[in-house]
């Protein structure tokens, strides 16, 4: 939204010409004092350089002001050297070169990525668009027609990227996430905010962030690459948020309607294995809204078996499970959806997969899949690039649609069902003044081959306002300790984030929008 997140600045490499140095002690003293380096180490390397070297680097990526201070000191000492009072800093050399700078330090670090000492981009935007940002000649594919490509003129200064990220919303998401980790004792967390109509990502907050200006500290912040941006890289079992997709498939195949009822006995047998509801209790006669409201596993297993494995997995594939979304950030994981015919697929998997167990997804995959429900059946491709400016011309990136897995009627029906289910239970996810659709998720984490209820992935995905969706928010808290349930942890975080979102995006409450529309 018009704020600079990554730019360019001039830094300096400071070294010495070993053939012309006259006073190594003066150089070691001046450089150590100005740059905060160890004098003894500097004098040792200057006096005992590696064999065969004529030029020795003392420091690199030195701030321009510090380099200027040393240059001025060198000039002053050269004037004194003319009188024979000092050897000066003869031999000290300065080489300028560009370095990527990040004015907001750690803000959105997981989205931006960084450029290393050699000028190569790693992670995020920096890696995915490395050729564009580095100023190399590039070819851009316009996503509205994959058969057409347009040349963008080569300009050595590189390309200015305009992102979809809303700076203030990103900062708010990071603050809310940090507070949520403390409040609920969670190990890690993620909040993603997207426009479900276009796929424009407005914020991607993760709990581990680094000051990109100090990229060399990467190893001290992260244990592995998936931790840099778990929103796109880290796979996990989503749990009950996936029930949205199972219900969508059941409605779309006319397996059920919202008013279809069944007798919930609390357990069901599939593939020789008994599956129970989350609370191990029967819930009696329920319709499909009650199925969602009470998040009944038995209901989902019944839906999947009535549809049949072929229908169920065809829909899950159409929703993109097990596939890359195509997000324009480096490091995306595809996750995995086992299907009949795979060596490790068993009949019971049809049942467990129906309520989000035994499926590996990323948060961005769930956002893409559920966008079909919020967007009249059309699934969007999440992206962070809004446009590019080159040669004074702006090239905007149009929305991409990844398919139409369900009908618009199914999407509208399910949205209303989800909204009713939240309202009926007075969910902590509700947002005053706005009707919201969404679903909680509580997925037990497998430990040594067994699921442990004390360790869960708590989540909530929701969107609104439901009559004109302008935002979709996904909250994922890993291993909350205050409560394992998504309804008690992720849901209130969603509500807080949504209330901030409608303010920052200037979305009026439902009654005001309805009054305006009726005029």
Regions found by a protein language model. Give the residues of each.
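Juxtamembrane extramembrane loops of integral membrane proteins
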Residues: 1-36
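Short beta->alpha transition motifs characteristic of CBS
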Residues: 8-13, 19, 115, 203-209
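Flexible, solvent-exposed loop/hinge segments and secondary-structure transition points
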Residues: 10, 178-198, 206, 348
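Envelope-exposed proteins and targeting segments
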Residues: 10-14, 52-54, 90, 105-110, ...
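Small/polar-residue-rich segments within soluble enzyme cores
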Residues: 16, 26-33, 47-158, 475, ...
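Extracytoplasmic/secreted proteins, especially bacterial periplasmic and envelope-associated proteins
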Residues: 26, 30, 41, 57, ...
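Conserved, well-ordered alpha-helix/loop/beta-strand core segments that scaffold catalytic motifs
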Residues: 146-189
């Amino acid at each position: 939204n018009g704020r600079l997140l990554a730019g360019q600045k001039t830094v300096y490499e400071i070294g010495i010409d070993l053939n012309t140095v006259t006073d190594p002690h003066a150089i070691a003293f001046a450089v150590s004092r100005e740059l905060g380096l160890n004098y003894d180490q500097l004098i040792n390397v200057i006096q005992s350089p590696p064999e065969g070297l004529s030029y020795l680097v003392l420091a690199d990526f030195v701030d321009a002001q510090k380099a200027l201070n040393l240059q001025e000191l060198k000039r002053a000492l050269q004037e004194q050297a003319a009188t024979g009072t000092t050897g000066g800093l003869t031999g000290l050399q300065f080489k300028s070169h560009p370095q990527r700078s990040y004015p907001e330090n750690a803000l959105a670090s997981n989205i931006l990525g960084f450029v290393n000492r050699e000028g190569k981009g790693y992670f995020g935007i920096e890696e995915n668009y490395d050729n564009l940002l580095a100023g190399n000649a590039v070819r851009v594919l316009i996503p509205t027609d994959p058969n057409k490509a347009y040349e963008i003129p080569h300009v050595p200064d590189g390309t200015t990227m305009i992102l979809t990220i809303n700076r203030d919303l990103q900062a708010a998401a990071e603050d809310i996430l940090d507070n949520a980790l403390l409040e609920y004792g969670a190990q890690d967390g993620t909040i993603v905010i997207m426009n479900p109509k276009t796929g424009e990502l407005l914020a991607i907050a993760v709990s581990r962030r680094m000051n990109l200006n100090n990229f060399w500290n990467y190893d001290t912040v992260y244990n592995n690459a998936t931790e840099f941006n778990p929103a796109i890289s880290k796979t996990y079992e989503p749990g009950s948020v996936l029930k949205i997709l199972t219900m969508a498939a059941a409605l779309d195949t006319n397996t059920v309607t919202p008013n279809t009822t069944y007798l919930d006995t609390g357990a069901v047998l599939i593939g020789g294995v008994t599956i129970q509801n989350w609370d191990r209790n029967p819930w009696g006669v329920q319709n499909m809204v009650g199925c969602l409201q009470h998040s009944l596993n038995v209901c989902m297993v019944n839906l999947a078996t009535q549809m049949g494995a072929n229908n169920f997995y065809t829909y899950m594939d159409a929703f993109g499970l097990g596939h890359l979304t195509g997000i324009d950030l480096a490091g995306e994981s595809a996750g995995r959806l086992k299907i009949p015919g795979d060596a490790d697929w068993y009949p019971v998997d049809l049942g467990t997969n129906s309520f989000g167990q035994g499926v590996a997804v990323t948060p961005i995959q769930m956002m893409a899949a559920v966008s079909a429900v919020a967007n009249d059946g059309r699934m969007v491709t999440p992206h962070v690039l809004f446009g590019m400016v080159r040669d004074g011309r702006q090239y905007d990136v149009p929305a991409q649609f990844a398919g139409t897995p369900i009908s618009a009627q199914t999407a509208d029906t399910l949205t209303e069902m989800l909204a009713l289910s939240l309202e009926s239970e007075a969910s902590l996810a509700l947002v005053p003044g706005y009707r919201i659709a969404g679903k909680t998720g509580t997925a037990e984490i497998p430990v040594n081959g067994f699921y442990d209820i004390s360790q869960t992935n708590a989540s909530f995905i929701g969107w609104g306002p439901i009559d004109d969706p302008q935002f979709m928010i996904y909250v994922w808290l890993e291993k909350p300790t205050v409560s394992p349930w998504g309804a008690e942890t992720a849901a209130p975080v969603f509500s807080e984030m949504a209330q901030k979102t409608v303010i920052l995006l200037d979305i009026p409450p439902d009654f005001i929008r309805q009054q305006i529309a009726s005029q």
